[in-house]
Amino acid sequence: MKASSVLLGLAPLAALAAPTPEAELSARQAQQSIDALMKAKGKLYFGTATDQGLLNTGKNSAIIKADFGQVTPENSMKWQSLENTRGQYNWAPADALVNFAVSNNKSIRGHTLIWHSQLPGWVNNINDRNQLTTVIQNHVATVMGRWKGKIRAWDVVNEIFNEDGTMRQSVFSRVLGEDFVRIAFEAARKADPNAKLYINDYNLDSPNAAKLTKGMVAHVKKWLAAGVPIDGIGSQGHLQSGQGNGLAQAIKALADSGVKEVAVTELDIQGNNANDYAAVTKGCLAVPACVGITAWGVRDNDSWRPQGNPLLFDSNYNPKAAYNSVVQALK
């Protein structure tokens, strides 16, 4: 465990014991930190997604500092954002997020290294196996190497399964077959041996879904047996109202695949969602391998799907019933 991790582990206890300063409470408008409560239950964090622009908007920064213990960059670490033109890197937005997190003792989740979407055209146009292998290895080494030791976990591969559990068609699977998964994870382990390496996907929201059973769990078991260094599975958790209990059960099914960790990585729940947020929180608490939950944003109108009011804070940064349901689930 790094020294920063030790400090993170001690901070919530102090936060629970001491009264919250009035000025801080006004800035964040929540009575209790769900991150502090989560850590008091033995988990690592309750986090949120953000990026440079959001950190400079309204009360986002103050709320993240007070109520969340982990951050995931929503877009700034995706391949197209970092290297849309080959060899020309745009580091500034991602650097800003990392610097914010480090200076405020927040854990970081790197998102994401290998993904079929938001991918530069020059990568999509590669047809040679050896060339694509080298490009993957260099990308992973360069990106992870820039923040080595600062990022706790990485989504190494993202959204690689179809709904029936088969592998999604992409430049990676077309040119390399399933072997791109091994190539990416081995490169990631070499780039930062201490980082936790994840495979991440959506619609893993029912323990009986084919995408979970025939896709994620079956493949991860096979890859682990072959020595692929996968540490964890991330279930994104982009839910509709009423799906919270299904995801809670699915967390256990994912943990049973043999990975060391599971996490809910991009949680948002459309509709009347307080009961669902509570169910997901309790589901993570019930599974020892579940290390934490990340909400996919702070307030509703900054969400990628704002029409369903899916997050924990409303447009005025007031904590919603969903936030309070998480607080109650953690008591």
Curated annotation (Swiss-Prot):
It comes from the Eukaryota. Disulfide bonds join C284-C290. InterPro entries: GH10, GH10_dom, Glycoside_hydrolase_SF. SUPFAM superfamilies: (Trans)glycosidases. One of its GO terms (molecular function) is endo-1,4-beta-xylanase activity. This is Endo-1,4-beta-xylanase 2. GO terms for cellular component: extracellular region. The gene is XYL2. Belongs to the glycosyl hydrolase 10 (cellulase F) family. It is found in: Secreted. Its EC number is 3.2.1.8. Pfam families: Glyco_hydro_10 (PF00331). Residues 31-329 form the GH10 domain. Endo-1,4-beta-xylanase involved in the hydrolysis of xylan, a major structural heterogeneous polysaccharide found in plant biomass representing the second most abundant polysaccharide in the biosphere, after cellulose. Accounts for approximately 70 percent of the endoxylanase activity in the culture filtrate. Glycans are attached at N105, N301. Pathway: Glycan degradation; xylan degradation. It catalyses: Endohydrolysis of (1->4)-beta-D-xylosidic linkages in xylans. The active site is at E159, E266. GO terms for biological process: xylan catabolic process. Keywords: Carbohydrate metabolism, Disulfide bond, Glycoprotein, Glycosidase, Hydrolase, Polysaccharide degradation, Secreted, Signal, Xylan degradation. Residues 1-17 form the signal peptide. It comes from Pyricularia oryzae (strain 70-15 / ATCC MYA-4617 / FGSC 8958).
